Amino acid sequence: MKARHLSLVLLVAVGCAAVCAGAEEHADGIVARILENAAKIKAADPKAVPMAFWDFDGTIIKGDITGGWDDDWNILYKGLVHRTIEAGLNSVYSGEEGLKQFFDVDYPRLRRGIGKWLAWPFLAQMYFGQSESELDAFCRAECEKVYRKWFYASSVKMLHALEKAGVENYIISASPELFVRSACDSLGLPAARFRGIRVHVACGRITTQIVYPVPDGEGKVENLRDIVLARPHGVAVAAFGNSYSTDGAFLRYVAKQPSLPGGAIGTAVMINGRHPAEGYAEHFVKVSQDETVGGMRTQTTARPPSAAGHHDP
């Protein structure tokens, strides 16, 4: 058993070095660490399916696919809320007047006056009555054309290296599921591996009925558990995020899991995280990354637009 385990570790380490070439410095080491623990799990339980869980906005994509990205002076890219309103695919807002009403009045009032518990689900609900397939096709095309260039190169390299080595990758995001799922073709993952804020679909049309739990904070932990339980022999071996408030809970959950097969330890990676919340800092591998797949760069410290960007630090 020990010889077999050593062979698995050597195999995944060599594979990691090849796949992760060109990524930022931390990528190779993180992948090697995760695959070493995945090898321990497989050695102890050959039927086990190692799984890695990713946040999306700020973790895979630089910025926010829902709200867009600017540098205080220029719009670097418009988010899918903006683009769907422009395209006439939003059921509440349309045209320039609709854009102003949403970005300048309604969403800021919801987010700041009431709270994200109502504001974030509204981002998925305001497409009620729209054809799910039509909206899905539009969002996928936008991702291929615009957003994939803003994917962090290191995140994509790590995700692909893990997938190639047999670790299944899943995305859990507080963006609308239709938005985050648009990255499935760009990332080469099945659409079923994406979990965002969900609404029921009836007769091919989007409804306003939210599917709970909403994947934010502890809700991400609940969604992660549901996904693992639904995957025969699934084991959560890694988690990636960028925000202590929205991702901290599910990262800590993966890092502190007791009794993983083979004595494996879950790896939790905090990407570009700001000041750590109490009780989180000691559990995470903290890294900084900036390089994108398309070589996209910002002139200043960019941030999501104040009205449109829906995620907290």
Name each region found by the language model.
Residues A13, A18-F56, K62-D64, G68, ...:
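Non-catalytic pre-domain segments flanking phosphatase-related domains
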Residues M1, C20-A23, A39-P46, L80-T84, ...:
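Short, flexible coil/linker elements and helix-boundary hinge sites characteristic
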Residues A39-K42, L123, A183:
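Short amphipathic alpha-helices and their capping/turn segments at secondary-structure boundaries
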Residues D57-T59, I65-T66, V199, G273-H275:
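Solvent-exposed coil/turn segments that connect beta secondary-structure elements
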Residues I65-T66, D72-K157:
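A metal-dependent, Asp-based hydrolase signature
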Residues M1-L8:
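Bacterial N-terminal signal peptides that target proteins for export
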Residues V9-V14, V254:
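Low-complexity, intrinsically disordered/propeptide-like segments
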Residues E25-R33, A44, V49-M51, S133-Y170, ...:
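C-terminal cap/substrate-recognition subdomain and adjoining C-terminal extension
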